Amino acid sequence: GSGGATNGFDATGTNNPSLFTFNNPSGVWEVVSNTNSNTLTAGTAYRLMVRGDRTINLSSNTPTPTTTILRATGSLKTGNFTPTLNQTADGYSFVGNPYQAPIDIKAVLSASSNMNPDVTYYWDPTLNTRGGFVTRDLSLNSNSVASNFNQYLQPGQAVFVKKANTNLTASMTITE
């Protein structure tokens, strides 16, 4: 990321950003510029570009991925979580699982107001050679492509959800 090690990222030749959040109200990706002063928050969905272990040649645009382990520390989230949502009709919001236990996103969407309860969009890193999106039809319990993703959002996992095609206010509460 920008500033390399000074801002809490591994230094690279370009120091291009590798950690992003999705601004749900505006529908745009935003760079996380510093992990030393910006604490990652449970429930906030992040897009992280993982290159693999530190032996990867960063001068190549297509290095072979390597296995790596990411570790998180901090306090466990307890209590209800209410994400800020995109209020545009058919607007997308990126929502993360705030807990260290799976959540049933189908049940969450069914209990939400003015959200599309039938569809979610997951990133599956095992598709193709670099990953790809999977559309999960919750009403049919099926995926758009062969993928192991289901309605249970795992700890540390995020998903795009869609607002219903309405001008009414959408709301969602994820309960523990």
What are these regions (language model features)?
Residues 1-176:
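N-terminal exported-region signature
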